[in-house]
């Protein structure tokens, strides 16, 4: 955990500011960022649209699949747009929208594999990873 704390401290010391949105597994990342002093320098907002209706509202549409690459990309794009709404255009090169959507262990019989998608949106690029 010490390495994670050091990494998060470096993030908080940077010029970057983020809006983080997570649904399903991955919500602990928000908690981890907020636990380390300096979070107010980094985190502009965080969202946890956990229910389907909440996700529909966050995306302004109902996605084809809630845990998918397309949904993760849309979440990150909307998170980036939230950054722009909060602060002025001067800092936009330092804004990052980050999203995580995951389908992991649950209390009912799971249909399909465990999976997650992480996406990052900035002014100049979009990146994602899936597993």
Predicted regions and their residues:
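Short alpha-helical segments enriched in small residues
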Residues: 1-131
